Amino acid sequence: MTRQWEILREYDEIKYEFFEGIAKVTINRPEVRNAFTPKTVAEMIDAFSRARDDQNVSVIVLTGEGDKAFCSGGDQKKRGHGGYVGEDDIPRLNVLDLQRLIRVIPKPVIAMVRGYAIGGGNVLNVVCDLTIAADNAIFGQTGPKVGSFDAGYGSGYLARIVGHKKAREIWYLCRQYNAQEALDMGLVNTVVPLEQVEDETVKWCKDIMQHSPTALRFLKAAMNADTDGLAGLQQMAGDATLLYYTTDEAKEGRDAFKEKRNPDFDQFPKFP
């Protein structure tokens, strides 16, 4: 099915589009298998932040341009002494900020993977909430081959997903795994023919959009809290505070302060 995606904002190295409640962020560097630069990542951070704040967006899809690659990680040609060097000549590892943003956005983020999801590209797949893989998808880590590694979500959280033994295999041997192997180890949620991957992804998005956004927000925060320590707890606590602010009980405290009177909290139930 052909869809008319609406361009929400123009970028140099990514696309940011919208269709019926779905925001789609596409890494647009197919000539290098959608490897990212500091600029690519900065643009993705901006797009994801806009999707987070947009009340018309219910689900976010992350993908790569073309059928050959989702993302092949950091562009090694941009790698300098202390990180990946952008136009400002400052070495950065700002993809770590993007990983955290994807985790804390209170909306489901789905990776739509076609072709290679390698290195930092596989880590982006890992931090997304769900993954729809085309049958030509290839996953793997290359860090130890090129003098790099991801000691955060790319290893610790990966081990939670596929198990410690498998995660060590993935990192120590730097092998590549096809879509079926990724499905078998729990790295993706489903595998579909390449020509159906967008249709299936949109279907999953539409199914998700039938459900309570507040419930989904808390479920994401709860599952993140299990792996993200105090930062994860902060996310869930912040969501709880936001929900509390919408209650009459919280509004009574606020209004009493503004009206310079004592709050009447006795009117509210004390549930067991």
From Swiss-Prot:
GO BP annotations, alphabetical order: menaquinone biosynthetic process
GO MF annotation terms: 1,4-dihydroxy-2-naphthoyl-CoA synthase activity
Residues marked Important for catalysis (site): 84, 245
Enzyme Commission number(s) from the entry: 4.1.3.36
InterPro entries recorded: ClpP/crotonase-like_dom_sf, DHNA-CoA_synthase_MenB, Enoyl-CoA_hyd/isom_CS, Enoyl-CoA_hydra/iso, Enoyl-CoA_hydra_C
Pathway field: Quinol/quinone metabolism; 1,4-dihydroxy-2-naphthoate biosynthesis; 1,4-dihydroxy-2-naphthoate from chorismate: step 6/7; Quinol/quinone metabolism; menaquinone biosynthesis
Keywords, sorted A to Z: Lyase, Menaquinone biosynthesis
Keyword tRNA processing on entry: no
Any GO CC annotation of this UniProt entry: cytosol
One Pfam entry name: ECH_1
Residues holding hydrogencarbonate: 141-143
Cofactor(s) required for function per UniProt: hydrogencarbonate
Catalyzed reactions: 2-succinylbenzoyl-CoA + H(+) = 1,4-dihydroxy-2-naphthoyl-CoA + H2O
Residues bound to substrate: 33, 72-76, 84, 116-120, 142, 148, 245, 260
SUPFAM superfamilies the record matches: ClpP/crotonase (SSF52096)
Protein family according to the UniProt entry: Belongs to the enoyl-CoA hydratase/isomerase family. MenB subfamily.
Function as written in the Swiss-Prot or TrEMBL entry: Converts o-succinylbenzoyl-CoA (OSB-CoA) to 1,4-dihydroxy-2-naphthoyl-CoA (DHNA-CoA).
Identification of the protein by name: 1,4-dihydroxy-2-naphthoyl-CoA synthase
Lineage of producing organism: Bacteria, Bacillati, Bacillota, Bacilli, Bacillales
Name of the gene: menB
